[in-house]
């Protein structure tokens, strides 16, 4: 399905009775082909979705609430368009479920079917809300650099590495990622963490590269994969991981993670801007 056929940017009737058909899958393959990503994938990882506006009725008609987290594997053939995800979650509002396990089972079944792969679902109840963490991405901030920038369309030529120097292991972060929804043009704001092992990457060039996404259009997952593949091609690190945390829209935040080496799943800690 093409994004143009999704609910994005269209007048919407909000359903309040459970309806799995509201989920709108979008194949990953098209955007990957545009940047030369084929099989086998040069990375693995996950897309972490946090849903803050989930509510349903219990068997006695009393409203229940939870925060849902979805872990969508990067190798799944589809992503889910975010407005359709919001509408789908909203359809739970006036539907009675026997238990929270029944809600979780429905979410896992439906989102897995839309994505074409097994999706992990976790639900945090109000009793657990105080345990939820807020933290910033670890790493050396690129935003400390005082530099000029005037390129706002993606330009990987900014990416360079010093291959005549000894390899390093670095974790770099920036809060200056901004891209735009390819359907509505709405801005998407994000923070990015880049961990690599290899020839030292020029920090100023890397920051200018991230800034060059400012007028770029692409879904969150596609932008992170473009960042990953551009750094991999231009700088040739032995190990590379890219993790972005985007600010919330419509009660959802999307946090894609891509890596080419085995490591633990990144923390799902909400940043201050989220």
From Swiss-Prot:
EC number, as in UniProt: 1.7.1.13
Residues reported in the UniProt entry to bind substrate: 80-82, 220-221
Entry keyword Cytoplasm: yes
Predominant place of localization: cytoplasm
InterPro entries linked to this entry: GTP-CH-I_C/QueF, NADPH_dep_7-cyano-7-deazaG_red, QueF, QueF_N, QueF_type2
Molecular function per GO: preQ1 synthase activity
Residues annotated as catalytic: 181, 188
Compartments, record wording: Cytoplasm
Pathway where this protein functions: tRNA modification; tRNA-queuosine biosynthesis
Function comment: Catalyzes the NADPH-dependent reduction of 7-cyano-7-deazaguanine (preQ0) to 7-aminomethyl-7-deazaguanine (preQ1).
Subunit structure, interactors included: Homodimer.
Protein name per Swiss-Prot or TrEMBL: NADPH-dependent 7-cyano-7-deazaguanine reductase
Organism: Burkholderia thailandensis (strain ATCC 700388 / DSM 13276 / CCUG 48851 / CIP 106301 / E264)
Gene designation per UniProt: queF
């Amino acid at each position: 399905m093409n994004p143009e056929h999704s609910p994005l940017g269209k007048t919407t009737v909000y359903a309040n009775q459970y309806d799995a058909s509201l989920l709108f899958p979008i194949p990953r393959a098209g955007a990957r082909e545009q940047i030369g990503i084929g099989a086998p994938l040069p990375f693995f990882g996950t897309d972490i979705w946090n849903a803050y506006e989930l509510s349903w009725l219990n068997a006695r008609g009393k409203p229940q609430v939870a925060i849902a987290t979805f872990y969508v594997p990067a190798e799944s053939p589809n992503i889910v368009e975010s407005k359709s995800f919001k509408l789908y979650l909203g359809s739970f509002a006036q539907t009675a479920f026997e238990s929270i396990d029944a809600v979780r089972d429905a979410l896992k079944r439906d989102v897995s079917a839309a994505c074409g792969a097994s999706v992990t679902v976790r639900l945090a109840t109000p009793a657990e809300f105080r345990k939820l963490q807020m933290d910033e991405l670890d790493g050396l901030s690129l935003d400390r650099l005082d530099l000029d920038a005037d390129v706002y369309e993606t330009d990987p030529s900014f990416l360079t590495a010093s291959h005549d120097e000894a390899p390093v292991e670095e974790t770099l972060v920036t809060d200056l990622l901004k891209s735009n929804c390819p359907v509505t043009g709405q801005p998407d704001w994000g923070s990015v963490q880049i961990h690599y092992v290899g020839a030292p990457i020029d920090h100023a060039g890397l920051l200018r590269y991230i800034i060059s996404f400012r007028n770029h259009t692409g879904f969150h997952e596609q932008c992170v994969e473009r960042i990953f593949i551009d750094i991999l091609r231009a700088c040739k690190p032995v190990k590379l991981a890219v993790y972005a945390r985007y600010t919330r829209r419509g009660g959802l935040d999307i946090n894609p993670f891509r890596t080419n080496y085995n490591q633990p799943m990144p923390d799902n800690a909400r940043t201050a801007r989220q």
